[in-house]
Design a protein with these regions (language model features):
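Catalytic histidine site
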Residues: 1-36, 143-144
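Active-site region of chymotrypsin-like
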Residues: 1-8, 66-71, 97-165
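Conserved active-site neighborhood of the chymotrypsin/trypsin-like protease fold
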Residues: 19-89, 94-98, 112-113
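C-terminal cap/linker of serine protease catalytic domains
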Residues: 140-205
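Single-residue signature of alpha-solenoid repeat helices
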Residues: 206, 240, 278, 285, ...
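Helix-start (N-cap) detector for alpha-helical repeat units in TPR-like alpha-solenoids
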Residues: 221-222, 253-259, 296-302, 332-334, ...
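Canonical tetratricopeptide repeat
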Residues: 226, 260, 304, 338, ...
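Register position in tetratricopeptide repeats
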Residues: 233, 267-271, 311-312, 345-346, ...
């Protein structure tokens, strides 16, 4: 029986145990939309469905695992032939109903599995009940045809061999099931699952996957780190601390445990430093990475040391560390980017910052150029500070392309300002219009557009845009100032002066000068 999130029954069906540790097979449909499921065996014992072990929506079948030990039926390893006898075994607490059947046809799929077709009238309420052969082995589970009166059965061997992969958490069918997927048996796939679960928006499944990973790989640091990150996200720093201390005791590679513990502390101190936790500080993070480096002196640990040094405000020292690392085996674009940030904090000439960002970009593998997106954005911002506005616009545009246009209204507003200073007015009008389209209730963008229209002598448009700005924000002085200037330039001096006075009342610093200029 499957249940909705509110506890109401979603669907009921049947299934077969195929393993000693709760492994079972059934049809898929009852699980779609389910938040939980409970299996009742032939003795009336109830067991929670803990994990979905695999699904196939084409054949509408699923493999899952329940809590507790189970007594399985044997699954046939060889196909039953057309014309052979089979028996449909329906569920019952005392004595099951057995219906004899003859295999009408057998279709082979995926070169090795069988899809059985029967012509028989089946008892009610037998969906997903097993068909067994003369040896009592399960050959498939019952599925009514959607197009004829025939009865179908998908090979039980196929269903028992269903399994999850590293991408199962992103599978569209799996997403419709509230019960967590099982962890793949292959460690590399399990690691991929762990990573994908952290990115998916399902905290219940994420927590289950992390727990399973720790149980399955108790000497690997990845599960403990993922659990500590969950605690960190919830501001439960004490639990995160205990989790990483457990990792240090249990994992095989102690250096990795100290390294990941350092990163957890660093992330808390950098991104959540407004929430105090006495046991942690940047010195503690540095202590942990030093322990890792003492066990296994590798450059990636030195990079963590440099990041902590930067976070402590020791910018020159951090710069030297980042630049030293560019001469090691881990030379990569991020190191030059880190170094550029140090130079900015040291108030170095902007040309030095730009040179380092140039290196970050040129060091990026051309096949992975999307990774250079933040470097183009940083260089665009650097160009703006040096009044190199056209170069800035080019880099903003490269950034937009590299992130597939996944930018917000503020991005277009910022690029528009660079375009105005570069005298690229047509592009600027397009960008500020795009910003308004993405954030139609932001008065700043209307004021910016009206100001630009005023600049390029589009007076009617400037009046319309400024009026819209005032409608959105009646207390926003910029709207009145620009509207007043546009009206004066259009020949409507009386209304224009009135709006300049309104801008002055609202505290616009330029309003008085404009009033004096146009009063003459």
């Amino acid at each position: 029986t499957t249940y909705n999130a509110d506890g109401t029954v979603l669907s009921t069906s049947h299934g077969v145990f195929v393993g000693n540790n709760g492994e079972a097979i059934s049809d898929l449909k009852p699980f779609i939309g389910a938040s939980k499921a409970i299996v009742t065996d032939s003795k009336g014992r109830e067991m929670n469905v803990e994990r979905i072990m695999g699904v196939n929506d084409i054949y509408d079948v699923a493999k899952f695992k329940v809590s507790g030990k189970t007594i399985p039926l044997n699954v046939a390893q060889s196909a039953s032939a057309s014309g052979s006898q089979a028996w449909l075994v329906s569920y019952a607490e005392k004595s099951p109903t057995i219906t004899a059947a003859t295999v009408k046809n057998v279709e082979t799929f995926m070169d090795k599995y069988s899809y059985y077709i029967f012509s028989l009238t089946v008892p009610e309420n037998t969906n997903a009940c097993p068909f067994v052969n003369s040896e009592g082995q399960v050959i498939g589970i019952m599925q009514p045809s959607t197009t004829s009166t025939d009865i179908h059965a998908t090979d039980a061997k196929f269903i028992t061999e269903l399994q999850t992969t590293g991408l199962s958490v992103e599978d569209e069918t799996m997403k419709k099931i509230g019960i967590p997927p099982s962890l793949p048996t292959d460690k590399s796939q399990a690691l991929l699952t762990l990573m994908m679960a952290a990115q998916a928006n399902d905290s219940i499944k994420h927590a289950a996957i992390v727990s399973d990973f720790i149980n399955q790989y108790p000497t690997s640091v990845d599960g403990y780190t993922a659990q500590a990150q969950i605690y960190l996200d919830a501001n439960d720093f004490e639990s995160a601390e205990k989790e990483m201390e457990t990792a240090i005791k249990k994992v095989e590679n102690k250096d990795e445990a100290h390294y990941n513990y350092s990163k957890i502390i660093y992330n808390k101190e950098v991104y959540k430093n407004d929430i105090p936790y006495a046991a942690w500080n940047l010195d503690k993070a540095f202590e942990e990475i030093n322990k890792a480096y003492a066990i296994n002196p590798q450059p990636s640990y030195q990079h963590q040391q440099a990041l902590i040094t930067y976070a402590k405000g020791e910018y020159q020292k951090a710069y030297d560390m980042f630049m030293d690392l560019t001469k090691t085996s881990i030379r990569n674009p991020e190191l030059f980017y880190n170094a550029s940030q140090c130079k900015q904090m040291l108030k170095a000439p902007m040309k030095e910052v730009i040179a380092l960002l140039d290196s970050a970009i040129t060091t990026t593998d051309t096949l992975r150029l999307r990774e250079a997106a933040p470097y183009f954005l940083a260089r665009a911002e650097a160009y703006v500070t040096t009044d190199s506005f056209r170069q800035a616009v080019f880099d903003y545009t490269r950034y937009e392309i590299l992130v597939n246009g996944n930018v917000n209204a503020n991005f277009y507003y910022i690029r528009e300002q660079a375009e105005v200073k570069a005298k690229l007015y047509q592009q600027a009008l397009i960008d500020i219009s795009t910003a308004i389209m993405l954030a139609p209730k932001e008065p700043t963008y209307y004021a910016e557009k009206a100001s630009l229209e005023l600049r390029v002598n589009m007076m009617d448009d400037a009046i319309k845009t400024a009026t819209k700005c005032i409608e959105l924000a009646p207390e926003y002085a910029d709207g009145y100032l620009i509207l007043g200037l546009a009206q004066i330039n259009k020949g409507d001096k009386a209304n224009g002066m009135s709006n300049l006075e309104k801008a002055k009342e609202l505290g616009h610093v330029q309003a008085q000068a404009m009033i004096e200029k146009y009063s003459k």
